[in-house]
Design a protein with these regions (language model features):
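Alpha/beta-hydrolase fold active-site neighborhood
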Residues: 2-3, 46, 173-198, 346-487, ...
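Catalytic-loop region of hydrolases
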Residues: 2-7, 15-205, 214-218, 344-350, ...
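Glycine-rich nucleophile elbow surrounding the catalytic serine of serine-hydrolase chemistry
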Residues: 119, 251, 269-281
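A catalytic-pocket lid/entrance helix-loop region that shapes and gates access to the active site
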Residues: 156-197, 279-349, 395-404, 415-416
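Conserved acidic catalytic loop of the alpha/beta-hydrolase fold
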Residues: 250-264
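Conserved strand-to-loop "acid loop" that flanks and positions the catalytic carboxylate
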Residues: 488-496
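Conserved alpha/beta-hydrolase "acid-adjacent" motif
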Residues: 498-503
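Histidine-bearing beta->alpha loop at or near hydrolase active sites
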Residues: 521-527
């Protein structure tokens, strides 16, 4: 969630209808109160009581040991594969912590970057861009790879070039890896979306009626069954694909909390990480400390409901981008916008580019690589996450439209997709939300998504079909999460968030018994780390002193 190299977004705090108010308007709760010793769930005593062997590890490069004092320490701990059978198979969870830089350590702050399927180990390596100096001084910041991911016991699939743990970085910058660097390498702040473009061409095929809907579903089913068989053949232990649900991850997180020495979990979760945090607070309200959920997921939504919300969100964000491009805001110095006319015309020009590239892919600087419409659509959608990087998207579109050259689109696509893991993403989501509907209802949803989002509706649809084909399904029906008895939970929502629409943050804050909504009137996905001092100060104040923002606090950008 880097603030970015292209723009610094300055926020001004406004109370709802009450003029300017300070970010910390409610009396501070002071240091985290001494807590009674957290209870250990029956049968899990050996896991909660295990000894953690922390070792010095490299500042970058995952869990690699270091002979130097880098300020980072790593460890792996053991948890049950199946919490209903704790005496059975076990798996490992990898942790990496950045030691508090201040003299008065307040404990540990656990963080999750989203996904599902993204690495908290990688996230904490970027602590200086992910977390403020205030938070770095106060806390040991611990990132962990959830079960099924990265350096933990991971879902492993053969990508055709040898076995790879799902979520393992393939080089370049992962979509949840806002590491400072060149403008290209820093192009995408994060992409922890509940739904992303599927890897199979059939996900987009048929959007213009090229094939029948039942044929589209047949193709999706075939592809996802093949992918599941591939992953099942390479993943060990064999039962892992049935135990990567978020409830299990939340139970792992409580083990990690206990092993850190804290009686309360302090937590910062982004996007999917908000769902994990809410599940944790519901399971362990007495163990919940200071929790911030940024870019919230509404737990009442079905797979289809989430997809529909995102389809509308991305289409709205696309129009906002076009307006800023045409007004000269989303361009680099000395560059023009290739999108002519009004916003409607500009959106149509992007759609026309996608359609044209599907028919005749664009050449690139590499004679062996071309760029099709699906790649362009994916780049456009991914770069809508971070408005500070819209000038890079403009440059890529300008090259593609005016020169028929997809070179820069391909560069951005490679950066945006490095380290992504479609199998883990579906393995988790399909276990979290049961399949609903049938081919008839899916086609209705598909047509509705095409209507509300002509640009992205097709690629975001048919999530239930994919999960049905994947075959590892959950039974936990979508329902409100209340987390009764938990400490205050700060829910941060961005009004122009395409991936987790603002309405989702409103819904989660309303559902949580102790939820409080903090609003950023900005564009892009999530707010903390990429908005401005209003949001940052409010979040930091809560995490470090327990100060809850004024109810209804809204932070405006650009003032």
């Amino acid at each position: 969630m880097s603030a970015g190299a292209l723009a610094a977004v300055v926020g001004v705090c406004l109370g709802a209808g009450a003029g300017v108010v300070p970010a910390a308007a409610v009396p501070a709760a002071g240091p985290a109160p001494a807590a009674t010793k957290a209870a250990v769930p029956q049968g899990l005593e050996s896991f909660y009581g295990q000894k953690v062997e922390w070792y010095d590890c490299a500042a970058t490069g995952g869990m690699e040991k270091s002979a130097d004092k880098t300020g980072f320490q790593c460890a792996k701990v053991t948890v049950p594969l199946d919490y209903s059978h704790p005496d059975g198979q076990t798996i490992e969870i990898a942790m990496k912590k950045h030691l508090a830089t201040g003299s008065t350590r307040q404990g540990a702050l656990f963080a999750n970057p989203g996904g599902p399927g993204y690495s908290g180990v990688d996230m904490v390596e970027n602590n200086e861009t992910q977390f403020s100096p205030t938070v770095n001084q106060a806390y040991d910041i611990i990132g962990f790879d959830p079960r099924g991911v990265g350096s933990s016991t991971a879902i492993t699939c053969d990508d055709g070039a040898g076995q790879q743990p799902a979520g393992a970085a393939q080089g370049g910058m992962g979509v949840d890896d806002p590491l400072p660097g060149s403008l290209i390498a820093d192009a995408v702040g994060d992409d922890p979306t509940p739904f992303r473009d599927a890897q199979d061409p059939a996900a987009d095929g048929g959007a213009e009626g090229n094939i029948s809907f039942p044929t589209l579903i047949d193709e999706i089913t075939k592809d996802f069954k093949q992918e599941e068989a591939n992953c099942a053949a390479h993943t060990k232990p064999a039962g892992l694909l049935d135990h990567v649900d978020t409830v299990s991850v939340a139970r792992d997180l409580d083990v990690l909390r206990a092993l850190s020495g804290d009686q309360k979990l302090n937590y910062l979760g982004f996007s999917y990480g908000t769902y994990l945090g809410a599940i944790y607070a519901d399971l362990f309200p007495a163990n919940t400390g200071r929790m911030v959920l940024d870019g919230a997921v509404d737990p009442t939504l079905s797979l289809g409901g989430r997809a529909a919300g995102q389809a509308k969100g991305f289409e709205t964000s696309l129009r906002t981008y076009v307006e800023q491009c045409q007004s000269g805001q989303a361009v680099q110095e000395g560059q023009g916008c290739p999108l002519t006319g009004d916003a409607d015309a500009g959106v149509q020009q992007i759609r026309a580019l996608i359609t044209s590239a599907d028919q005749t892919p664009l050449k690139t600087a590499d004679p062996n690589v071309t760029v099709d419409g699906r790649t362009i659509r994916s780049v456009v959608r991914r770069f809508l996450y971070s408005s500070e990087y819209w000038p890079l998207l403009t440059y890529a579109l300008d090259q593609a439209i005016t020169q028929k050259d997809g070179s820069y689109v391909q560069v951005l696509y490679g950066r945006a997709t490095a380290g992504s893991s479609t199998p883990t993403f579906y393995a988790v989501n399909c276990q979290d939300i049961p399949v609903q509907g049938d081919v008839t209802s899916w086609e209705k949803e598909y047509r509705q998504n095409l209507q509300s989002s002509p640009t992205f509706g097709a690629s975001l649809s048919n999530q239930d079909a994919r999960c049905q084909a994947w075959g590892h399904s959950g039974t936990r029906e979508p329902a409100p999460i209340h987390a009764k008895g938990a400490a205050p939970i700060l829910v941060v929502g961005t009004t122009g968030d395409p991936a987790t629409p603002y309405a989702w943050a409103q819904a989660l804050a309303e559902q949580l018994e102790s939820g409080q909504l903090l609003t950023w009137e900005g564009d892009g996905h999530t707010a903390y780390g990429r908005s401005g001092p209003c949001i940052h100060d409010a979040v930091d104040a809560y995490l470090t002193s327990g100060t809850v923002p004024e109810p209804g606090l809204t932070c405006k950008s650009g003032q």
